[in-house]
Amino acid sequence: MRERNRSALHEKLCQILGSRNVYHDPPATIKMNYPCIVYKRDSVSPRKADNISFIKWYPYSVQVISKDPDFPLFDTFLDNFDYGSEGAPFVADNLHHSNFTIFT
């Protein structure tokens, strides 16, 4: 189930970005092409009642990375998901990063 969800998420992220520059937890040795999306799974967030899990959210940490500080996806990324939040953006190595947490 989890792998199927990740595969579907990967395809959705490719569609949102409009390219295949989407990387799941890439090793440091990979050369990424920009703009890109990098994502990894976070710990599961179960919702409980009477000590029984009745729903599990699968959170993913997502970074949208671009050389362009005005890359439009920075402002519209969360419009593509029902549940998510935005973290603090930052610049490293002249690349602009916007951080998001999404739930599947």
Predicted regions span which residues?
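Short, solvent-exposed beta-strand/turn "edge" segments of beta-rich domains on protein surfaces
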Residues: 49-53, 91-92
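Short intrinsically disordered coil segments
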Residues: 52-57, 77-80
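Loop/helix-junction capping segments adjacent to catalytic residues or to phosphate/diphosphate-binding pockets
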Residues: 3, 71-72
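Oligomerization/assembly interface segments of phage tail-like spikes and tubes
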Residues: 54-68, 96-104
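Long, highly charged amphipathic alpha-helices
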Residues: 8, 12, 72-77
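Short, cysteine-centered beta-strand-loop-beta hairpins and adjacent loop/turn segments enriched
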Residues: 46-47, 68
